[in-house]
Each structure stands twice: as C-alpha cells, then as structure tokens.
UniProtKB/Swiss-Prot annotation:
Protein name stated in the entry: Acetyl-coenzyme A carboxylase carboxyl transferase subunit beta
Protein's UniProt keywords contain Cytoplasm: yes
Record bears the keyword Ion transport: no
EC number annotated for this UniProt entry: 2.1.3.15
Source organism of the structure: Staphylococcus aureus (strain MSSA476)
Superkingdom, taxonomy of origin: Bacteria
Xref: PANTHER family: ACETYL-COENZYME A CARBOXYLASE CARBOXYL TRANSFERASE SUBUNIT BETA, CHLOROPLASTIC (PTHR42995:SF5)
Reactions it catalyzes: N(6)-carboxybiotinyl-L-lysyl-[protein] + acetyl-CoA = N(6)-biotinyl-L-lysyl-[protein] + malonyl-CoA
Compartment(s) of residence: Cytoplasm
Subunit note: Acetyl-CoA carboxylase is a heterohexamer composed of biotin carboxyl carrier protein (AccB), biotin carboxylase (AccC) and two subunits each of ACCase subunit alpha (AccA) and ACCase subunit beta (AccD).
Keyword annotations of the record: ATP-binding, Cytoplasm, Fatty acid biosynthesis, Fatty acid metabolism, Lipid biosynthesis, Lipid metabolism, Metal-binding, Nucleotide-binding, Transferase, Zinc, Zinc-finger
Cofactor binding, per record: Binds 1 zinc ion per subunit.
The protein's annotated pathway: Lipid metabolism; malonyl-CoA biosynthesis; malonyl-CoA from acetyl-CoA: step 1/1
Cofactor(s) of this protein: Zn(2+)
C-alpha cells in the first residue's frame, strides 16, 4: 500500500490558451430593454424611436432625437444653447456634477429649446432630457423655457413642451421652486394671446414640473405607462394610510380620471401633433 502511495502518478498540468479572436461586441452596437431585458440592435431600435420590439416599452429618447422625430428635416433652430447653471447657493460639488453631466450628455442643461416646422407649420418647442440631473428644474431650465414661450407669444406661434423630470433641483433651493410660478406666468400670457400650448408628458414627469408647466397645457398628451405625479407613491401611502391602486400615477390612470387628453404611442407622436397643429392653424386663420 505504501509503495503504491509513493509511486502514484501525478496529475498532468494543462495550460489554457485563450483564443486570440476577440468575441466582444463593440460598445453601442446592442441595447438591452430595461423592462423585458431583450437585446436589440441599437440602430434598429433607433429607427423604431426607441420602442422595444418585444414588450413595447418606450425607452427614453434624447432631446435632439425627440426633436428630430417631430420636425421637418433641417427646420430646427436652437435657442440659448450655451446657457448653463451657476451655483447661487454655493452648494457643495454642484458645479462638478453639472460638468460631469455636460460631458456625459453633450448638453449644457437639461432642456433644449428652439423653433421648428412640422409639415411646414412653424412652432416653438422645449424638450427636457432626463439624462442631465434627472431633468431636475433649476434656474436655467426656467429661463430657457420662459424665453421660448415669450418668443412664441411675440411671434404668434404654438408651443410644444416635452417634460421629463424628477422635479425641482434641490441644489438651487427656492430659486428652483420659483421657476414653477415664472414659467406659469409666461404660459398665461401665451394663452391670453389665443395661442396653443401642447404639453407632452413623458416618463418620468414628477415633482415641481408636474405641478407647474407640465400640467397646464391646452392639450395634455402622454406616452404609454409614463410615470406622472407629484409626491412618491410610498410617501402618499404613508400619509393617507391607504394602499394605492397598482396603476396609480401612470398615464393610463390619469387619462381614465380626466387629467390627460390622450395617451399616444410614440410611433404616432408626429402624426398626432401634426393633426393638432393643423386644426389650430385652421381655427386661427
């Protein structure tokens, strides 16, 4: 037995040689749906306006992609592109976070504004981009939105605003909250001039944005399953000590309760806006 113990064969050692061929998929080629996890070609997904082929989930669009989808080619003129936030309250690390988001998104702030044409009809537009500070509303967002609204009022143009926001920007305190009233005043002047304001609420539209300019459109539209509300679901349940419906704060729930005029699939977004603008154009002739 001892002889066998000392004479047992040693296990052979093997060296694993990795295949020199690189099988990694280049970054950006594929996109995974955040809801159903299906992996799709990014190019094909973009051609479908970032709507998942499998579960129909509306994946976020960038501000410029949204504008491209609803406007005639080459018709968009951007306003106030270089406007950027200061740090009025000297909030720690605020400017560093702003700079980081600027590098990540290529934007100066969380809203893009300007004029464009849709089927030859000119309109003013503001599109929020939730990639930048979660679309939170600060002084620059309020100022840019007011400027484009005032331009539309002076030039008698309809105005379309796509909201996507987590609410007021806490780093700017009361200055951020002031934008709720400021934008509402500009919209009132636009309304008094007999002009059309279309509010298009996308996922998510919450907090101070939902409580101000996002909810006061002449026509309020939304995308399917968009989260729309003021306070969070958990906060409300704890406050009223009741269980809320499963579909609470969804676009469909708001439509059912009269707070939206229509829930529009993104593939029908351009056509729907064109039809509304044509009706307004005929009425105001």
């Amino acid at each position: 037995m001892f002889k066998d113990f000392f004479n047992r064969t040693k296990k052979k050692k093997y060296l694993t040689v990795q295949d020199s061929k690189n099988n990694d998929v280049p970054a950006g080629i594929m996109t995974k749906c955040p809801k159903c996890k299906k992996i799709m070609y990014t190019k094909e997904l973009a051609e479908n306006l970032n709507v998942c082929f499998n579960c129909d989930h509306h994946i976020a669009l960038t501000a410029y992609k949204r504008i491209e989808a609803i406007s005639d080619e080459g018709s968009f003129t951007e306003f106030d592109k270089g406007m950027t936030s200061a740090n009025p309250l000297d909030f720690p690390s605020y400017l560093e976070k702003i700079e980081k988001d600027q590098q990540k998104t290529g934007l100066k702030e969380a809203v893009v504004t300007g004029t464009a044409q849709l089927d030859g009809m000119k309109f003013g537009v503001a599109v929020m981009d939730s990639r930048f500070r979660m679309g939170s509303m600060g002084s620059v967002i309020g100022e840019k939105i007011c400027r484009i609204i005032d331009y539309c009022t002076e030039n008698r143009l309809p105005f379309i605003l796509f909201s996507a926001s987590g609410g007021a920007r806490m780093q700017e305190g009361i200055i951020s909250l002031m934008q709720m009233g400021k934008t509402s005043v500009s919209l009132k002047r636009h309304s008094d001039a007999g002009l059309l304001y279309i509010s298009y609420l996308t996922h998510p539209t919450t907090g101070g944005v939902s409580a101000s300019f996002a909810s006061v459109g002449d026509i309020n539209l939304s995308e399917p399953k968009a989260l729309i509300g003021f306070a969070g679901r958990r906060v409300i349940e704890q406050t009223i000590n009741e269980k809320l419906p499963d579909d609470f704060q969804t676009a469909e729930f708001l439509l059912e309760h009269g707070q939206l005029d229509k829930v529009v699939h993104r593939n029908n977004m351009r056509q729907t806006l064109s039809e509304i603008l044509k009706i307004h154009q005929e009425v105001t002739k």
